[in-house]
């Protein structure tokens, strides 16, 4: 066995010391063979952060790394691989059946293998690259083998700089098809280099961009990768490519289409190549390897176009044809390795497909649709929301009308004037917020009207913040009335302070949020006219003030209850009952008025999937302001006198 290894080392021109260590490792592996399972760790799992390493199964190299989570070992990465120069090119496999316990030696040999595979490939079949296909296709799709093939495809794409023919593209696609198989998706999770799937996408696109078409049409079809290419002239009346592929062996076919309009083709000075590559499983592979919380819901279409073509249309059939979740057209950001909704615009969408208009460039060359993970759509919730908004708007209009009718009667004292000033402004701002919310809901959907959406979102943000800050002003006013005598400050000073808090603070917050996030297109959500969360966390500009005000209002309610309880101490039973009723009235009024019910609104932000939170918030939101007018005895008496 030793002479064979020495012969191998001489063939690869490896250092003598490496060969000696390699031979020693081989001898040790023959002396000691264990029968323990290779996918389970033997170490003690004690959650101290120390990983566990296990050796690979026989006839493979590398190791498996485990991490302790919840007192159980979970596999994190795996570098086990069987592919090497000899297994791929059907040479003496015994030369690479070495099992080494030294991870440094394995890593060194792993990189030397990749170089040797590439060198041997260029020596044996440089014209069509076909001599590696059989060896790769019969190899198991373990994580280490996937990494070897990805690196090989990357090396090929960087080595061959021009004049890629159809035969080479056919072989290259066959290699990629093996690791794009739907059965290999779970193994991508354990590849040591998390960017391997990104490297694969970039390598395939780079290699295909060097394709030179002798004929006017190229059609290279495999199960998990399909390439179409043609030559298009400037005067062509549009062009489209249609792909139809299965996600796995049992699924129905899913289609994807690339359309080039005649108007766009007029921008190109002469004949040019158009190449498009479709991947049915690459979206799931990107999700698995990068561990992203996104779901690709269509084919991934990669395009190679001249720079003059600035806009293309793409039609994606949905893999999961659900009407409850919206889809978002996206492009793959090649530098940041993520899906970016700024590359595309959703033109039309239904339960079966989405139509996208995208802007290909050097950063965005691959496109697909994502299923929105947070958009909760339910007919029941929609009805409750709009019915609740209708009730709220009607109540607010009635409340404002009553305030106008009886204003002179209920504002005779300073405290009454300030209290009703807060009530009127809360009603007015909430009315405007509800109205702009309805406008924003009509502008949302598959087709986002960006400028209109920005305006609607700004006003919704501003007026809902104004509601909160006027609630804060009312809470501070109540607190001020309990602790301090009102006539210590002039009335004009108090009014100016209330307006500064109620309108000044939210206006500053809304303007700063817009100015900071909109230049980078991070102000809006991709699927709705509301503040962005995933990219810029602009939603915090609403959640943080709202949460802070809710806490302040809770403290205020507590202090009001304590104060009224103290007033009831020492009185007769009748007075105690009246005090308890008064406390209940305070809670009934202050809870909706001071925004405590908006805690459920924040809960809908934290847990967007909970239908119960959305329904409770919608119902409670309909009760804003109107309870205060309903239980105010002074207001009822004035209305009775006015109507009577």
From Swiss-Prot:
Name the organs or tissues of expression: Mainly expressed in skin and heart, and very weakly in lung and spleen. Detected in all epidermal layers of skin.
Q: List the disulfide bonds.
A: 329-356, 344-358
Signal peptide segment: 1-18
Region GPS: which residues?
Answer: 329-377
**Is Transmembrane tagged as a keyword?**
yes
PROSITE patterns under this entry? G_PROTEIN_RECEP_F2_4 (PS50261), GAIN_B (PS50221)
**What ranges does the Cytoplasmic topological domain annotation cover?**
408-422, 487-493, 563-585
Q: What does the entry give for GO biological process?
A: cell surface receptor signaling pathway
Where is it localised?
Answer: Membrane
Residues the record marks as carrying a glycan: 155, 219, 293, 311
Q: What happens when the gene is disrupted?
A: No visible phenotype.
Q: Which Pfam families match?
A: 7tm_2, GPS
- By its UniProt entry, which Gene3D superfamilies does this protein fall under? 2.60.220.50, Rhodopsin 7-helix transmembrane proteins (1.20.1070.10)
List the stretches on the Extracellular face of the membrane. Answer: 19-386, 444-465, 515-541, 607-610
Bilayer topology reads:
Multi-pass membrane protein
The molecular function GO annotations come to: G protein-coupled receptor activity
Q: Which InterPro entries match?
A: Adhesion_GPCR, GAIN_B, GAIN_dom_sf, GPCR_2-like_7TM, GPCR_2_secretin-like, GPS
Give the protein's function.
Orphan receptor.
Q: Which family does it belong to?
A: Belongs to the G-protein coupled receptor 2 family. Adhesion G-protein coupled receptor (ADGR) subfamily.
Q: What is this protein called?
A: Adhesion G-protein coupled receptor F2
UniProt source species: Mus musculus
Protein's gene: Adgrf2
């Amino acid at each position: 066995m030793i002479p064979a290894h020495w012969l191998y080392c001489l063939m690869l021109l490896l250092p003598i010391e490496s060969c000696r260590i390699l031979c020693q490792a081989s001898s040790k592996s023959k002396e000691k063979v264990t029968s323990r399972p290779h996918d389970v760790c033997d170490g003690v799992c004690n959650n101290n952060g120390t990983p566990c390493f296990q050796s690979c199964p026989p006839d493979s190299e590398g190791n498996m790394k485990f991490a302790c989570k919840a007192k159980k070992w979970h596999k994190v990465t795996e570098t086990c691989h069987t592919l090497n120069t000899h297994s791929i090119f059907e040479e003496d496999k015994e030369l690479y059946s070495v099992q080494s316990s030294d991870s440094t030696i394995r890593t060194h040999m792993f990189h030397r293998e990749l170089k040797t595979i590439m060198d041997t490939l260029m020596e044996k079949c440089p014209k069509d690259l076909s001599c590696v296909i059989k060896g790769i296709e019969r190899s198991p799709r373990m994580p280490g083998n996937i990494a070897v093939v990805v690196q090989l495809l990357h090396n090929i794409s960087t080595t061959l700089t021009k004049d890629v023919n159809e035969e080479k593209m056919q072989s290259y696609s066959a290699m990629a098809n093996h690791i794009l198989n739907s059965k290999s998706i779970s193994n991508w999770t354990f590849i040591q280099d998390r960017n391997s799937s990104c490297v694969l996408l970039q390598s395939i696109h780079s290699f295909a961009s060097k394709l030179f078409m002798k004929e006017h049409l190229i059609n290279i079809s495999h199960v998990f990768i399909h390439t179409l290419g043609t030559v298009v002239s400037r005067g062509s009346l549009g062009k489209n490519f249609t792909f139809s592929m299965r996600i796995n062996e049992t699924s129905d076919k899913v289609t994807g289409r690339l359309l080039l309009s005649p108007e766009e083709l007029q921008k190109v000075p002469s004949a040019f190549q158009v190449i498009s590559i479709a991947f049915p499983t690459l979206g799931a592979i990107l999700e698995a390897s990068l561990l992203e919380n996104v779901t690709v819901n269509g084919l991934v279409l990669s395009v190679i176009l001249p720079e003059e073509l600035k806009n293309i249309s793409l039609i994606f059939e949905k893999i999961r044809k659900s009407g409850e979740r919206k889809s978002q057209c996206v492009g793959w950001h090649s530098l940041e390795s993520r899906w970016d909704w700024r590359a595309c615009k959703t033109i039309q969408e239904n339960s079966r497909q989405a139509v996208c208009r995208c802007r290909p460039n050097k950063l965005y060359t691959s496109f697909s649709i994502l299923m929105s993970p947070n958009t909760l759509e339910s007919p029941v919730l929609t009805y409750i929301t709009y019915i609740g908004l209708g009730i709220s708007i009607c109540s607010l209009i009635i409340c404002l009308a009553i305030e106008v009718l009886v204003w002179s009667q209920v504002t005779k004292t300073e405290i009454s004037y300030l209290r009703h000033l807060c009530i009127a402004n809360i009603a007015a701002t909430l009315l405007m917020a509800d109205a702009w919310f309805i406008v924003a809901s009509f502008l949302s959907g598959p087709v986002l009207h960006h400028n209109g959406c920005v305006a609607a979102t700004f006003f919704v943000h501003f007026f809902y913040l104004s509601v909160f800050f006027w609630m804060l002003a009312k809470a501070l006013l109540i607190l001020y009335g309990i602790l301090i005598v009102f006539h210590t400050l002039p009335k004009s000073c108090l009014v100016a302070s209330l307006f500064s808090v109620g309108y000044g603070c939210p206006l500053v917050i809304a303007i700063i949020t817009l100015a900071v996030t909109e230049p980078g297109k991070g102000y809006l959500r991709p699927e709705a006219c509301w503040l962005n969360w995933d990219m810029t966390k602009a939603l915090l500009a609403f959640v943080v003030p709202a949460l802070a005000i809710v806490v302040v209002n809770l403290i205020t309610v507590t202090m009001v209850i304590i104060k009224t309880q103290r007033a009831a101490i020492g009185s007769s039973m009748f007075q105690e009952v009246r005090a308890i009723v008064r406390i209940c009235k305070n809670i009934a009024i202050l809870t909706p008025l001071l925004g405590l019910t908006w805690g459920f609104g924040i809960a809908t932000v934290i847990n967007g999937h909970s239908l119960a939170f959305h329904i409770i918030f919608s119902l409670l939101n309909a009760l804003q302001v109107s309870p205060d007018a309903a239980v105010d005895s002074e207001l009822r008496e004035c209305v009775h006198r006015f109507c009577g």
